[in-house]
Regions:
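Short, charged/polar connector segments at secondary-structure boundaries
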Residues: 1-79, 85-99
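Helical mechanochemical/support elements of P-loop NTPase systems and associated helical scaffolds
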Residues: 24-27, 31, 61-62, 87, ...
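Alpha-helical interaction elements
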Residues: 97-184
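Amphipathic alpha-helical extensions and coiled-coil-like segments
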Residues: 144, 148-265
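Short acidic DE-rich linear segments
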Residues: 272-282
C-alpha cells in the first residue's frame, strides 16, 4: 500500500550505506532553482523506519534542495517495504542516471545481490548452488542490460582498496585490469598503489594477469610487483599531477573529479588563446 503525504524534512533520513555519491553539481543548482520557483513536482519515495522517521529511497537531492531552501515539508510516497525490498528499488532507480561511477555501480550491484540473497535467492559459492548464483547475477543486471558476468566483475571492484578504486573512478586504471587486481590481498594492492604514487604509472591488463597468477602460485613478492610495474608500456598515459590545495579555490563546492578535469582543460585552453592574442598583437 502506498500513501501520499507531506513529511517534515527533519524526519527524512538518507538511505543507510547509500552507494551513490551526492553530487553538488550544476544539475543540483538547477534543481534548487526549479524547486524554488515551482516547488517539488515529483514526490520522493520513502519507507517508514523507527522513531517516526522515514528513510529516503528515491529523492535524496530533492530533499537536500528543500533543506537548503528552508522548505519544511516535502510530498512523499510512503511505501511499506523491507530494507531488502527498498535496496532493490534504490539500486534500480539510481542506475538509470546518466553518470554512474564504477565504484557506485560496484557497491550498488553488491547491495542488490545481498538483498536478493536475503529474500531467498541463494548466491552461495558452493558448486551445488552455482546455477542459482548465476541466475541472481543475471537478475541484478537485467534492469541495466548487463550480463551476469559483467555484474560479477563489477562486484569484484568492491574488493579493491579505496585508493585503487578511486583511480578506477578517475579513469587512471581501466576496468579489466582493476578486476584482476581485486584478486590480490590488500597488502599487495598497496604495493601496486605505492608504485603508482612514486612513478605515476598504472598496470596494464597483461601485467595484472601475471601478478594474479604469481599470487595464486605463492610467488608474488614486492620485488616481483616492482619489476612488473616498471616495465615500459606503449599505451601508458601521461598524467599531470597538481596538488588540489593549489586550485580548489577555483572550483565550485563538491565538483566531481571529471568536472575538475574539464574545468582545468578549459582554463588552459582559454589561457592559451589569451597568449596567442597577445603574441599576434605584439
Amino acid at each position: 500500500m502506498n500513501v501520499l503525504t507531506e513529511i517534515k524534512t527533519e524526519n527524512l533520513k538518507s538511505f543507510e550505506n547509500n552507494p551513490f555519491i551526492f553530487r553538488e553539481d550544476t544539475a543540483f543548482e538547477m534543481l534548487i532553482d526549479s524547486i524554488s520557483n515551482l516547488g517539488v513536482l515529483t514526490p520522493i519515495i520513502v519507507r517508514s523506519i523507527e522513531d517516526g522517521n522515514y528513510e529516503i529511497i528515491s529523492g535524496h537531492r530533492r530533499a537536500e534542495a528543500c533543506r537548503r531552501l528552508g522548505i519544511e515539508t516535502i510530498p512523499c510516497i510512503v511505501k511499506e517495504l523491507t530494507r531488502d525490498e527498498a535496496t532493490v528499488i534504490l539500486v534500480d532507480l539510481n542506475l538509470q542516471r546518466d553518470e554512474v561511477l564504477p565504484s557506485e555501480k560496484a557497491h550498488a550491484y553488491k547491495m542488490k545481490m545481498d538483498a536478493l540473497k536475503n529474500q531467498g535467492a541463494r548466491t552461495d559459492l558452493t558448486s551445488t548452488q552455482s546455477v542459482s548464483k548465476f541466475r541472481t547475477a543475471e537478475e541484478v543486471g537485467k534492469e541495466n542490460n548487463e550480463s551476469r558476468e559483467t555484474v560479477r566483475r563489477y562486484i569484484r571492484l568492491t574488493y579493491l582498496i579505496p585508493e585503487i578504486l578511486k583511480l578506477v573512478d578517475e579513469g587512471r586504471i581501466a576496468f579489466t585490469p582493476a578486476v584482476e587486481l581485486s584478486f590480490l590481498p590488500s597488502e599487495e594492492q598497496h604495493e601496486v598503489y605505492g608504485f603508482y604514487e612514486n612513478e605515476e604509472v598504472t598496470p596494464s591488463y597483461s601485467q595484472t594477469v601475471r601478478m594474479k597468477k604469481l599470487y595464486s602460485e605463492g610467488m608474488l613478492t614486492s620485488d616481483k610487483i616492482s619489476d612488473i610495474m616498471a616495465e615500459a608500456k606503449a599505451n601508458q598515459k601521461d598524467f599531470l599531477k597538481i596538488p588540489t590545495e593549489n586550485i580548489n579555490k577555483y572550483f565550485k563546492s563538491r565538483f566531481t573529479e571529471k568536472q575538475k578535469q574539464e574545468f582545468v582543460i578549459k582554463a588552459v585552453e582559454h589561457y592559451h588563446r589569451f597568449l596567442m592574442r597577445q603574441r599576434d598583437a605584439g
